[in-house]
Amino acid sequence: FNAKKQLLEFLSEDIGRGDITSQLLPKRNISARIITRQIATVAGSRYAKEIFELKGCSVKILKKDGSKVKPNDTIMVISGDAKKILSCERTALNLLTRMSGIATQTDQLVKKISNKKTKLYSTRKTAPGLRYFDKEAVEIGGGGKHRLRLDEMVMIKDNHIAVGGSLLSLIKKAKKKYKKFEVEVENTVDAVLAAKEGATIIMLDNFSPVLIKKTIQVLKNQKLRHRVILEA
């Protein structure tokens, strides 16, 4: 992942051929601050800093990623040509606020999980271009990463089964090539099948809390629960 390349693309997307409004202003050096409006967990400060620096500005970070902030705290101070600061402020703020929002919500959710063995993970359901930033924000908030890319681990889902014929046949193929693989199931019967056949991880897709509890008990009764990691 080339963060600098991605940040330059973000800037190009917003600035286009130039910030024609800021070009109306006289040349003037200024100092600007990014101030918080609410209680939050900071994430993305280093990327916001890099965005400003790519335009030739100087940045001093006062609240690093992972910092807990309250209203009116200063996250960073930016110094430099006013035109340059104004041309990239929105790109920097958008990424900083997005990542901080994700980190803040993740932190709140993690604190609600009473069972310390239970972990909160992010999925691949992210907007193109933002995956690495979103997943890093989840980690800063106390969560973990699921797959970043399709080449990291086999994950057999409903559409694969629809094309491939059956869950069992795909599991057997996966077992021949990979030590670790995940299976998404839609019912308890398939969860048991996946566990018996050696799935490392089983995703209980759209299971209600009641059905999750029932499935866990069935796996325990058949002495299969210890074999697998469950996701829901």
Give the positions of each predicted feature.
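Acidic/glycine-rich phosphate/pyrophosphate-binding loops and surrounding catalytic core
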Residues: 1-197, 201, 213-214, 218, ...
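Short secondary-structure boundary segments
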Residues: 206
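Short acidic, S/G/P-rich loop/turn micro-motifs used as interaction or catalytic elements
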Residues: 209
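Intrinsic disorder/low-complexity segments
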Residues: 221-224
